[in-house]
Amino acid sequence: MEAFNFRLSNMIKAKRSHLCVGLDMNPEGLGSSNTTIEDLKAHTYKVIDSTYDLATAFKPNLGFFERWGSAGFKWLEEMMAYIGEDVIVIGDAKRGDIGNTAKQYAHSLFKHFKFDAVTLSPYMGVDSISPFVEDLSKGVFILCRTSNPSAIDIQDQPVGEGFLFDKIAKLCVEWNVNNNVGLVVGATAPEEISRIRSVAFGLPFLIPGIGAQGGDLKQSMLQGNKNGDALINISRSISFSGNLSEKSIRETAKDYLSQMRDIINL
């Protein structure tokens, strides 16, 4: 059985792509106050079809499916079957509970929905991580230094001789026994990317914040890919690009991918 981090690294090399397309299917993104779940389904499949050969991974944010209740969960099941197994699919769930609850979340995300990896919050410690890393073929990306403005309120708090995000990075290295642990590090904090990479050798980074949030693509690629792989997540800027056509979505994705390749001479 291949460890998740090996599989991710091999797929990045095979596709020459560090692109992760975020599937944050916001009804307002289609420009109508009357958007239905069927409208969003159709657009989601359009995004997937337009970028499938360009992306190493897709990252559905579960909140945009959960808002529709049982119909949203059915849509998520259908979408996972539609995507198939030729790309990596990361469930952006940000789970963070412990014990039996964490086990149920892991079963739901890995066994039922069949995600290849998920995002997790480390706030409750290793008890909230352990159930998700038992299967080395499944990966986790742990929130370390996120891209949102208020991240500094907690993640930049002093801990010992560093900051909380430093401590999280060091813990993630310890937790990476099965080579299936990665970190979420936002593109809006390029200095922190470099700092965290100096600690977390070999751990993959999932880097959100490019596009609508104004993150630094160049530094994300340069620093994130030192001694490890960086997966660059782009959501709204691709999914709701231009006139929302397949051509517009694909051209935007190709442009981002071209920029990434140029930055690291891939």
Indicate residue ranges for each PLM-predicted region:
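Conserved N-terminal beta1-alpha1 strand-loop-helix module at the mouth
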Residues: 1-88, 160, 247-261, 265
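Acidic (Asp/Glu)-rich catalytic clusters
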Residues: 12-14, 48-54, 77-85, 131-136, ...
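Conserved, mostly hydrophobic/aromatic
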Residues: 21, 58, 92, 118, ...
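Conserved anion-binding
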Residues: 26-27, 93, 97-184, 202
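Short, acidic/polar
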Residues: 35-51, 100-109, 128, 165, ...
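Active-site-adjacent beta->alpha loops and helix N-cap segments on the catalytic face
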Residues: 67-82, 98-102, 122-137, 187-198, ...
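A C-terminal functional module that forms or caps the active site or interfaces directly
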Residues: 187-233, 237
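C-terminal helical cap(s) of enzyme catalytic domains, especially alpha/beta-barrels
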Residues: 218-229, 236, 240-266
